[in-house]
Amino acid sequence: MKKLIIALGVLTLLYFTATLFVPPYIEGQRNPVKLASPYTISSEAQKIYNRLDFISDLHCDALLWGRDLTERGTRGHVDFPRMREANVGLEMFTIVTKSPAGQNMKSNSADSFDNITPLTIAKGESPANWFSLINRTLSQSNDLAGFISEEEGKAIFVKSKADLEQLIQVRSTDKSVIGAMLGIEGAHALEGSLENLDLVYEAGVRMIGPTHFFDNKLGGSAHGENLGGLTDFGRQVITRMNELGIFIDLAHCSPAIVDDVLSMTTEPVMVSHIGVKAVLNSQRNLSDKQIKRIAANGGIIGVAFFDMAVGEPELPNIIATIRHIRDVVGIEYIALG
């Protein structure tokens, strides 16, 4: 019995040690920064940037890695201090609950081993989160709420139009105040339950992508196996999202789901991070026809800043993507993604 107790003690010590070192290592491998700071910026560009009244970004997975977002980090790009340094007023923090092994842009199986499970365990999260997508969602929601609470009025959890208007008003005189919204990448997080949709709404979620990198109960992913449209359950979810006031994010949806959503939604959509086929002809990116339908819906398109969406070299292609959307429908439909 004594040896068993010692063995359990050693294992416990090893586990808690792993929670300190493994998540940062995984983030360093999976979420690398291509160009390290300091960055060279022309004085003219800096002047233009400083004149911008309100900067927002529609996509950030920083909650996934277990970092304290109230502290300036050394990994990734985003936390509250670096938002302030960059004059970013509003960030959409998105929750990732499942990632298939061998994740790629072309075809992924929903039955593949889930990469997020070992990360969840390594982060030292509650065993209730280890194998539950909805619990992972609520845990990350609570994390964001906690970070905002720690800011003692210097951060606003944006859950409504009134919250956004308050943020804009406050930032007109105090740029140190920042805002955060909450989204979900892939409605598989709902685990097939409409009741869970109401649950995540109460937790502060205001944007959900029907699919992420694989097909689910709502329909087909742009990177899945069947490229199908909305299922009956998918249509129920879209209807309920409209009723609640949750933005529909089409960033990873199959073309069929994009068409189905635009045909039935009663509210403007978002495409949080994406490119266009005219610049990079990938199955994920938007055609001119889709761009026009999104604009007609009153939606916005977040241009992604990475090679899988815009191709390489990235910066010229980001500019080309922005210009293309501008030329097709107008600058007012473009956002940062």
Task: Label each PLM-derived region with a short phrase.
Residues P210-H212, K217-Q290, G302-G311:
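Active-site core of metal-dependent hydrolases
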